[in-house]
């Protein structure tokens, strides 16, 4: 059994394996991992769950998950937003952030396995996806959110999605450097995107209600140091319910375990490890008896919402945060703001 993160009061090593078993149970023969039984799969959260498989040492299953992305990618480099286990497309939208995230997942896989042959195998897929995403960049550095197949991209960008894209672009540059490929165009796109995120939030569609717009520039390693700490502290009381976790939106008492885990990951990324652990401990309230995690809880009634939903991506987010807090592998540094490891 592989060594896995062990974070007392959050998730023991044995509990992590229990949680990953609930993700494995969802994985289809094709490699696809839907949100829940009978649910859809989106490529972003699919990558998140693949990373959880790698953390548990299930590298063959993680590679099967990435192979599903190889097999379903369009010739233009994109994926649709939602797929069903049958292979049918349930949402045809093309989301730039969804398409970019494979780079973060593949870099994470490399940090766990040092399997150069696998990275070379998926390189054409990563390259095509990242080139597509960069093609959606505007002159100001922002990257347009989405489009429908064959249509022009929508004319606005999102702060959360763009921050995640910045992290994915950084990972893509690491992969390119590992394989000795030129990545000048990607590096330039990353520099422009980071500049606008740090200096002109008005360039993005306002989504101030949403917790992800609050912490994602920190999680993605775009805003760092004192500025990152200030960003998290400034709206902490708006989004965090003490002892419960992070609200999905600041004006509703709906706490989601994934947002709680991602916010904890943001704290870990800037070195606030103990504060991250304390926040991630709140996700224990979402843990079910078999190790799966309920997506959200509404307070004070303690109503699980969406009703009956235990999502694989939620479990994966908790595992990723636990890995970062444990900090005992190179892969745990994936989101660390001051440590973007090349190791080529």
Residue ranges, per PLM feature:
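Short, surface-exposed loop/turn segments at secondary-structure junctions
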Residues: 34-37, 116-120, 180-184
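Active-site neighborhood of glycoside hydrolase catalytic domains
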Residues: 159-200
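Well-ordered alpha-helical scaffold segments within catalytic/enzyme domains
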Residues: 1-9, 47-61, 101-118, 163-180, ...
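Extended glycan-interaction surfaces of carbohydrate-active proteins
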Residues: 2-40, 63-95, 99, 123, ...
